[in-house]
Amino acid sequence: MARLRHIAVVVKDLDRAAEFYSKVFEFKRIGREDLDIGSAIYMSDGVINMALLNFRGKEGTKASDLKEGSTFVGAHHFGIQVDDLAETQKKIEAAGGKFFFDLGDERHGNFERKFKDPDGAIFDISKHGWQGTDGYTKK
């Protein structure tokens, strides 16, 4: 079976985004790459590789050819399973993240709390995880 091991998120400020995900979720910086079309900082929780991308959009590069490459921010959203929702929310907000809304019913285990990072990229946190994922717990 294929396994998801990589997600890429376009951000406005690489260092600020890397600091946010490192401070809140303890993701480790595992590399940086600077290319003609832009730069990336690679983070990991030990299983998933998260690429934080920033496209320069210089004339004649692939990013400028895509038009939205230099202005697009974020994937639609991604989710991170945590041990303590309230404690994680405090860390998110202290690091500059903003609460967005709650989705689902906590009594049935399909609950997630949505936030926006400092660049506006949307992400969820969940104590119980998501169906089909390692570590998912159904109430």
Segments from the language model and where they lie:
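Core segments of cupin and vicinal oxygen chelate
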Residues: 2, 8-50, 54-56
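Short beta-strand
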Residues: 31-34, 76, 104
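Vicinal oxygen chelate
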Residues: 3-12, 41-44, 64-139
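Acetyl-CoA-dependent GNAT
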Residues: 54-58, 127-130
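N-terminal beta-strand motif that seeds the catalytic metal site of vicinal oxygen chelate
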Residues: 1-18, 75-80, 126-139
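A short, polar/proline- and glycine-enriched secondary-structure boundary/capping micro-motif
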Residues: 61-65, 134-137
